[in-house]
Amino acid sequence: MVKVNADYLKLKAGYLFPEISRRITEFSSKNPNANLIRLGIGDVTEPLPLACREAMKAAIEEMGTEDGFRGYGPEQGYKWLREIISENDYISRGCEISAEEIFVSDGSKCDSSNILDILGKENKIAVTDPVYPVYVDTNVMTGRTGEANSVGEYTGLSYIPINSENGFEASIPKDKFDLIYLCFPNNPTGAVATKEQLVSWVKYAKENNSLILFDAAYEAFIKDESIPHSIFEIEGARDCAIEFRSFSKNAGFTGTRCAFTVIPKSLKGKAGIETVDLWSLWNRRQSTKFNGVSYVVQRGAEAVYSKEGKIQIKKLVSFYMDNAEIIKSNLTAAGFEVFGAVNAPYAWIKTPKNMSSWDFFDFLLEKANVVGTPGSGFGAAGEGYFRLSAFNSRENVEKAMERIVKLK
């Protein structure tokens, strides 16, 4: 009989969002007339920006001609897209990131998982808690952890708590870690990292020869001009960080699939006594395992940076952030303790009356027909919290707030 990857069997339970779907399905089967409002999974709802749609339509027509047809593209992404990303997202902010250091992909979720392909299993790993489940689960699946304890913490991983008690600030560890996952603006808490905090992290990483995996998927939602949008705004980060970005939330590409990862050519790692550059390893990995993002989609992503695209993206981001403000203001006025939802599209809510995260999930589902995300699904430190997403229509967000406020 064929042998399986037994590390998958160590996963504590079903992935968070499939478990949510299971509970919704069970509830809906018993309550077929319930009008559910979903503020759980962070999927966008508004149409693709016009500039992106028009660019993709033109690309489709181009592909219908002999001269314009394209087959396999470069695994790293087309040069014209990488150059415009470099100019707009990095050079404009004083970051020395070249087009060659940008790898276009079909999602930051994939990249933050696949990056483990080029990193050794012996690395000591730290994650924030609560945390985007993919960081933890992919380490489990690739044999980098032991078993989980009763609250879902795995041996082999170290957890850095971020909560209301510490102002949602990820404290610099006293111990040495080789690999550190940071996500700011943070999913799920909505917290941000100041420049001073990121300077401290870069200093720590350089002193300990650590690698920071920095997820900046929500950078477009930052309103505070003092908050960095990229780890590479910090001096020295080129030597200790990889950054993941995505078009999913700012441009509505969750169903279109386009993202990118930045790996500076100066970034080094160890293979025994030999020093190797991570850029070359990732380039080799992508060339072997990835055929690139479609030409049509990359033209759509390119349009994000056009004059019209920038206006439309700004409007789209503002729409979701207005939703976030509606959630935060309504729930705060109703007596809930609400964090985030200022520089990120997520509201992180303290559950009332010491309810558990899943009990509050079931309570809102049954009493208000509103779906959110239990904080405990993001880690032990998320217990007693609940995440609501701003990704929905204005009508649904306002209606959901009316329902929840009535319960209070």
UniProtKB/Swiss-Prot annotation:
Protein name according to UniProt: LL-diaminopimelate aminotransferase
Gene Ontology molecular function: any one: L,L-diaminopimelate aminotransferase activity
Residues recorded as bearing N6-(pyridoxal phosphate)lysine in the entry: K249
Organism: Prochlorococcus marinus (strain NATL1A)
Pfam family, one: Aminotran_1_2
E.C. code: 2.6.1.83
Keyword Magnesium among record annotations: no
Reactions listed under catalytic activity: (2S,6S)-2,6-diaminopimelate + 2-oxoglutarate = (S)-2,3,4,5-tetrahydrodipicolinate + L-glutamate + H2O + H(+)
Quaternary assembly: Homodimer.
